[in-house]
Amino acid sequence: ARPCGACAKQWPLVIFSHGSGAFRASYLYWTEFLASHGFVVMACDHAGSARYTQLDGAVVKPGGKRSKREQMEADRPKDMTFLIDCMEALATKGGDSRFAGRVDTSRVALTGMSFGGFATAAALEAKDPRVKAAVMKCPSISMSGTGALATDRTDKTTPVMVMLGSEDTV
């Protein structure tokens, strides 16, 4: 999206987390849609998640000996919070960033697809006061059996929309 020039208002921030085996550009239809409706969107590229990642040349099979699922479950929500922190630094009024004074980091939404939906739920567990809403599209569950989507939800107050397909068996 084009820079907003001398905007009088600040734009809310959306942090997007992709699904397993994907990367940030895999969901351009969603992130561009959000950006075209007045949101500043930051999309994660989570380490070790894309099918095309080759760090040491080894083959990693889901759930296999070299699977990093548990580590990714711990890291992905932290990646999302890290992006909020980064934008907060970039958006500081008076700074020299193109985002200075243009992004309202007190109005953040988290969104994600599949494993990114799990990351969104897990990031909500931190109860970051900057996060005002979340959208989880076909969220996966924790394979380690702990954390997001595995705890009592009665004390949660952040509005969340969960989108699922009735035929989704994953």
Locate each region found by the language model.
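Domain-level recognition of soluble alpha/beta enzyme cores
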Residues: 1-14, 26, 36
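The feature captures the conserved acid-bearing segment of alpha/beta-hydrolase catalytic domains
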Residues: 4-6, 132-170
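The conserved beta1-alpha1 loop
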Residues: 12-19, 45, 138, 164-165
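Conserved alpha/beta-hydrolase "nucleophile elbow" surrounding the catalytic nucleophile
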Residues: 18, 112-114
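Active-site machinery of serine-nucleophile hydrolases
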Residues: 25-63, 70-73, 77
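Alpha/beta-hydrolase active-site loop
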Residues: 59-105
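Short glycine-enriched nucleophile-adjacent loop
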Residues: 88, 117-128
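Residue in the alpha/beta-hydrolase core beta-strand immediately N-terminal to the catalytic nucleophile
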Residues: 97, 107-109, 133-135
